[in-house]
Design a protein with these regions (language model features):
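Secreted/periplasmic proteins
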Residues: 2-127
Length: 127
């Protein structure tokens, strides 16, 4: 387990928030970039969609395929009719195509979401 991940779990214990395990399907190429432009969001190194959090929320994404941990901004949300299905199937985030390269790994880019396991951690403000 990385030092950063240990620190995140300590912050989670001290400040509250949540940690969820699930999967990360991906957007088609350039879709997330169009969403970010349409919403006029400032630049961020990582953008994802969520069925749990509003636009602008910062979360930490742990990739179990690539063993990387990065902070991502929620740049899009699930369509209201898709929220229940996304939650039921444990699709915690949807990654932009570029983000999916590090979240899922290049060898899993064409696989089903279940082949892209993630943990999403959100620490309460002040943490």
């Amino acid at each position: 387990m990385s030092t950063l991940l240990i620190q995140l779990y300590i912050l989670l214990a001290l400040h509250g928030g949540e940690s969820m395990d699930g999967y990360a399907p991906r957007y088609a190429p350039n879709v997330m970039e169009r969403v970010v432009r349409h919403r006029d969001l400032p630049w961020a190194a990582c953008n994802v969609s969520s069925a749990y959090y509003p636009v602008g929320t910062l979360v930490w994404v742990v990739s179990w395929n690539t063993h990387q941990v990065r902070q991502c901004r929620i740049a899009d949300v699930s369509h209201p009719r898709a929220v229940a299905r996304h939650r039921r199937t444990k699709r915690l985030i949807e990654a932009g195509y570029e983000e999916a390269k590090w979240i899922c790994g290049l060898s899993h880019m064409r696989d089903r979401p279940e082949r892209c396991p993630v943990t999403v951690i959100r620490v309460n403000e002040g943490g």
